[in-house]
Design a protein with these regions (language model features):
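Nucleotide/pyrophosphate-binding catalytic subdomain
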Residues: 1-217, 264, 306, 315-317, ...
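Short linear loop/turn motifs
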Residues: 100-104, 233-238, 288-291
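Generic beta-strand/beta-sheet core signal
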Residues: 135, 173, 230, 284-286, ...
């Protein structure tokens, strides 16, 4: 049984019409001969932040397991809405969430790590139905408790499902068609990268690029899953970037939600850095108000929980990074407008003809 694996990010679901559009796309894929489809979905845009805010309003010290269970509601709601939209088109459809997907993790709530998979439940659903809607970014631990795989980790769910079903490709749909040399929302001159290697895009993700989750890319590399980045528009599907074992590109990334964690001593910083490194979290050594610190650009909630303790202070910042095959330059900027301005300047230095090239294409 050949299965098509698709993942739709929250930007596809700005309202009820988004679910209708995705459902129609699934119907078109089936009409084109793709009989079995798994569609992994994220929560509606802004839903996860809203759920977290509600939880913390009730209890600022809510347990990590309690938070994970609450955050999973966003994807579960999205699954129900898409299942309803697909069912209305007369397609046989079922849905699975973290409890039933067959993905087991450790108990690192907030950013759990996949430990084992069991494809029997999802294979059974595909035997009975033509489309299976799967909740992204969630699984269960060995005790059967819901776990959250991390922010934007629905990509990881899609890659894991592709691998566990023996498929070697999955499609990721977001509001941009692919990976670019910079965020096109803030750098209009950014150039689309047709093909890029796993390690290159994983590094971009760790330094702030939002197109793909770094954990998904790393899992895809280990299990030989090709990722195709696409965008679903009113005019159809736009294919942008294929992520495989080959390809590199210079880029400028902007991490808008980075945090700076300051410590009482250099020794304490070094100890906490080692802990974060063990958990695969990229950090940069910084000095903040004459105190040694670490800047964290991804998995920030999980990182802050790992290093929490007395004598620690936390602040926010933005990080602009130039990524090159031989050079990595990092700039910490406190103001968003200045960060965007710097990113555009650095991109222009990196690709001096980009503006003219885009105008020429237009």
């Amino acid at each position: 049984m050949t299965v098509t694996i698709l993942k739709f990010g929250g930007s596809n679901f700005l309202g009820p019409e988004g679910y209708d559009r995705v459902a129609r796309h699934l119907a078109q894929r089936r009409a084109a001969g793709e009989n079995k489809i798994v569609a992994v979905v994220s929560a509606m845009k802004g839903e996860t932040d809203s759920l977290k805010a509600q939880m913390l309003a009730v209890n600022k010290k809510a347990s990590p397991s309690n938070l994970d269970a609450a955050l999973a509601i966003g994807e579960m709601k999205s699954v129900c809405l898409l299942e309803a939209a697909v069912s209305r088109l007369g397609i046989s459809v079922a849905s699975l969430n973290g409890y039933s997907l067959g993905i087991r993790t450790n108990s690192d709530f907030g950013r759990a790590t996949v430990k084992s998979v069991d494809p029997r439940r999802i294979r059974s659903a595909l035997q009975e139905h033509d489309v299976v809607i799967a909740a992204g970014a969630q699984a269960i631990d060995q005790s059967g408790r819901l776990t959250f795989l991390g922010r934007n980790a629905s990509d990881l769910t899609a890659v894991v499902i592709a691998s566990m079903l023996g498929e070697h490709a999955c499609e990721i749909y977001s509001d941009v068609p692919g990976v670019s040399t910079g965020d096109p929302n803030i750098i209009p001159e950014a150039l689309l990268i047709p093909e890029i290697g796993y390690q290159a895009i994983a590094e971009m993700s760790r330094y702030g690029a939002k197109v793909l989750h770094h954990g998904a890319v790393e899992y895809a590399e280990r299990h030989a899953v090709t990722i195709m980045c696409k965008s679903l528009t009113n005019d159809g599907v736009v294919t942008g970037t294929t992520v495989t074992g080959h390809g590199n590109a210079r880029s400028v990334t902007v991490a808008r939600d980075a945090v700076v964690i300051s410590f009482a001593s250099v020794a304490e910083r070094d100890n906490r850095r080692a802990l974060l490194d063990q958990n695969g979290i990229t950090t940069i050594d910084v000095d903040q108000n004459d105190r040694p610190g670490l800047c964290v650009m991804s998995d920030t909630d999980f990182a802050m929980r790992l290093v929490e303790g007395t004598g620690i202070s936390i602040g926010s910042t933005m990080v602009v990074t130039v990524l090159d095959a031989s050079v990595r330059r990092v700039h910490l900027i406190g103001d968003y407008e200045r960060a965007v301005s710097l990113a555009r300047q650095l991109h222009e230095q990196m690709y001096p003809g980009a503006v003219a090239e885009r105008l020429g294409r237009g």
